[in-house]
């Protein structure tokens, strides 16, 4: 080969970087970059999505290590911040002129739409992390032109920087808008920390076209946990459901969607009427003809702005947003009772406005010339109403409340202010997370109040004594562990609700949930309450132990016992200081959405026809609400299975010959190649693991078990915990993850 002339010449012509701009091994155009190309999800669209367990990594957070937003917010002079917002609201900008010379109504819509994505079903959405800055929310049809509202606030954000998050600023601007226009607000709390990427865990629906709703309704029933009647809307279509201008029909959809946001009829009427006391809608012309792409689809030169409007000036009197045009009152920048005055004073007829959308005007030209134009002082208009406004008059229940507010304006103002506070703070969790001088002192039931600890807390000696008493009760590892897990695992990182503090697992509705095995739960609670009573009565001072603390301590005892039996002496961390909520402090209806449809950690899956998600998807969803990482989810499930901590005491997924011990047997056996697995149910939800040689069934498992051998990412983690030399690490990692779950709601420790 070396004597071959052509070969010699080829070898002589070795490519050198300075001789050519084109490497022969990397020829051709560079069309795609890292992250592009056909993805795994393109090939396998049903692949389990574990990305929701690795959101908001420190790798994407631009703040310094150790940055504490709560402390930064506390350093603000809130009155000075508010004054800057007041001043900004009446300083109209040429690039986006203020209606009536006041940006207040615009900021109210912005704040409302930031918070209004919240839904009580899973606690996701809401204003808590400033998600309105990111797609898809920044490009929802219902959020049209709110990109301008946020940009108008940039001077304030720029001035206060890291001390004022976007999430807090959006809500604060809404509060300031109300105050600037004459309404006393119920309060404001800061503490919403920004995130730096779009939320991946929120299911907004399965539709692939904006404003569609063909996937979310099975007949008249809205898919759970969705809170909007159409893809890309906050609540309902203001023209009427599916564009049908029927106020009575629309009322039922309003009731459902606002109910999904945890609002009752009284609060719903207050919010709609109060919000529509201010400002106007915008539909100067047909949006389909004149409005261009939303921010996420706009060109790079648009610099984050979307919905470019080519009609007239594109702003001011020519603005197109919802496609509906008009104002509700003749004082759109002042708080008043005129919304109800107009609603009841006029008879209304349905028309199509200049934007081509259904809207309502007073019959017989009544009210003409009473409403000022937003930009031209020489023009006057009649008031208008949306189809959904007329629902407040034509639905019998809404009408009663509307008329009551009409006749009692002071109550209306208070009801609206309180409902607004609930709207904008519903996802902030317990009041101890609220920051700032305007936090209301009044305790509200929807805040899931827990009494302050007003007694001396147990010390290490007391803890050791109580642990011995729990051990001597004869309660099993399974009973101790599942009770503590059931108490703590109600926590939702989405809206910061649930958790072990308050001890609400002993109260309705949690004490009746199937997943908590009510009969067994009652036995455990009765036993622990006897220990609590004996301990508290034996104290000469103010020292007490709460049942909330005892439940968690009992779980720690169970884990320690399981570890010791497996040969590991350890002490599970325990931090006392929880208090006991009462039944009167517990809104049963509001707690019902926290009941799990599934808890893969206890191998519980409710048999519901409308739950189409797989067991493994529901497991990951639960893990995300518990703020767990992939390894934490994995080690917790494996440990729970080894301890036999299924909700009903079943053997499903308990892949061990020594249940009740904290071992890594689950992982060893799920990785065992001497087994073959076969579905034992038509629905492929339960499986038998048989000896490959004899065919004898050795184990039974659910999809939430088998996924750790099937999914390549989870199998990789399972392999770490399934080796012969890892049991000590497994126990350590389990205890760390367990302690995390037990303290998820302990904001006093953070």
From Swiss-Prot:
It is an enzyme of class 1 (oxidoreductase). Gene3D superfamilies: 1.10.520.10, Peroxidase, domain 2. The keyword RNA-binding does not apply. There is a cross-link at residues 235-261 (Tryptophyl-tyrosyl-methioninium (Tyr-Met) (with W-112)). The active site is at residue 113. Heme b binds at residue 276. The record marks 109 as: Transition state stabilizer. There is a cross-link at residues 112-235 (Tryptophyl-tyrosyl-methioninium (Trp-Tyr) (with M-261)). Keywords: Heme, Hydrogen peroxide, Iron, Metal-binding, Oxidoreductase, Peroxidase. Its cofactor is heme b. Homodimer or homotetramer. Bifunctional enzyme with both catalase and broad-spectrum peroxidase activity. This is Catalase-peroxidase. It comes from Christiangramia forsetii (strain DSM 17595 / CGMCC 1.15422 / KT0803).
């Amino acid at each position: 080969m070396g004597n071959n002339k052509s070969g010699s010449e080829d070898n002589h012509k070795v490519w050198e970087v300075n001789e050519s701009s084109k490497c022969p091994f990397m020829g051709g155009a560079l069309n795609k970059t890292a992250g592009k190309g056909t993805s795994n999800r393109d090939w396998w669209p049903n692949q389990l999505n574990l990305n929701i367990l690795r959101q908001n990594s420190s790798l994407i957070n631009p703040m310094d290590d150790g940055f504490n937003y709560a402390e930064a917010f506390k350093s603000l002079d809130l009155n000075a911040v508010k004054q800057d917002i007041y001043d900004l609201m009446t300083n109209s900008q040429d690039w986006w002129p203020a209606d009536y010379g006041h940006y207040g109504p615009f900021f109210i819509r912005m704040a409302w739409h930031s918070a209004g994505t919240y839904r009580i079903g899973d606690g996701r959405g809401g204003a808590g992390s400033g998600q309105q800055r990111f797609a898809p929310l920044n490009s929802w049809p219902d959020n049209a032109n709110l990109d301008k509202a946020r940009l108008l606030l940039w001077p304030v954000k720029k001035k206060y920087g890291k001390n004022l998050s976007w999430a807090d600023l959006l809500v604060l601007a809404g509060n300031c808008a109300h105050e600037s226009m004459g309404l006393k607000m119920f309060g404001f709390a800061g503490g919403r920390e920004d995130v730096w990427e779009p939320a991946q865990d929120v299911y907004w629906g399965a539709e692939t076209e904006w404003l569609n709703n063909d996937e979310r309704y099975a007949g008249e029933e809205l898919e759970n946990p969705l809170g909007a009647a159409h893809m890309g809307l906050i609540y309902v279509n203001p023209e009427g459901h599916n564009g049908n201008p029927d106020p009575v029909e629309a009322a039922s959809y309003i009731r459902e969607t606002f109910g999904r946001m945890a609002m009752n009829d009284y609060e719903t009427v207050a919010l709609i009427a109060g919000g529509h006391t201010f400002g106007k809608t915008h539909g100067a012309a047909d949006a389909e003809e004149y409005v261009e792409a939303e921010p996420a689809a706009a060109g790079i030169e648009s610099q984050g702005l979307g919905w470019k409007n080519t009609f007239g000036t594109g702003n001011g009197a020519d603005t197109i947003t919802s496609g509906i045009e008009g104002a509700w009152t003749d004082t759109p920048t002042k708080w008043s009772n005129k919304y109800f005055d107009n609603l009841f004073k006029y008879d209304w007829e349905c028309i199509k406005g200049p934007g081509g959308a259904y809207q309502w005007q007073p019959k017989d030209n009544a009210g003409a010339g009473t409403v000022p134009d937003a930009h031209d002082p020489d023009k006057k208009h009649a008031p208008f109403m949306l189809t959904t406004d007329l629902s407040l008059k034509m639905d019998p229940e809404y009408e009663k409340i509307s008329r009551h507010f009409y006749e009692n304006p002071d109550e209306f103002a208070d009801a609206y202010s309180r409902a607004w506070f609930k709207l904008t703070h519903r996802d902030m969790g317990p009041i101890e997370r609220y920051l700032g001088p305007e936090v209301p002192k009044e305790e509200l039931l929807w805040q899931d109040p827990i009494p302050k600890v007003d007694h001396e807390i147990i010390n290490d000696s007391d803890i050791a004594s109580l642990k011995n008493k729990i051990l001597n009760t004869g309660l099993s590892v399974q009973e101790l562990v599942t009770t503590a897990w059931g108490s703590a695992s109600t926590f939702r990182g989405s809206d910061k609700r649930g958790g072990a503090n308050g001890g609400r697992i002993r109260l309705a509705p949690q004490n009746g949930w199937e997943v908590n095995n009510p009969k067994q739960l009652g036995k455990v609670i009765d036993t622990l309450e006897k220990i609590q009573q004996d301990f508290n009565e034996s104290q000469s001072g103010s020292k007490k132990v709460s049942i909330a603390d005892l439940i968690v301590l009992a779980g720690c005892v169970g884990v320690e016992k399981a570890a010791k039996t497996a040969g590991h002496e350890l002490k599970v961390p325990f931090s006392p200081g929880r208090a006991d909520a009462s039944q009167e402090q517990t809104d049963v209806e509001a707690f019902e959405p926290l009941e799990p449809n599934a808890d893969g950690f206890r191998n519980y899956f409710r048999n519901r026809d409308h739950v189409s998600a797989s067991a493994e998807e529901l497991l990951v969803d639960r893990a995300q609400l518990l703020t767990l990482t992939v390894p934490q989810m994995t080690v917790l499930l494996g440990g729970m299975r080894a301890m036999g901590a299924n909700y009903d005491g079943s053997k499903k997924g308990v892949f061990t010959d020594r249940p009740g011990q904290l071992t890594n047997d689950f992982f060893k056996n799920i990785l065992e190649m001497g087994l073959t697995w076969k579905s034992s149910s038509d629905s492929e939800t339960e499986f038998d693991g048989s000896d490959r040689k004899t065919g004898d069934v050795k184990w039974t498992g659910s999809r939430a078990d088998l996924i750790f051998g099937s999914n390549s990412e989870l199998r990789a983690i399972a392999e770490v915990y399934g080796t012969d030399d890892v049991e000590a690490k497994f126990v350590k990692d389990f205890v760390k993850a367990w302690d995390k779950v037990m303290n998820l709601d302990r904001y006093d420790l953070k």
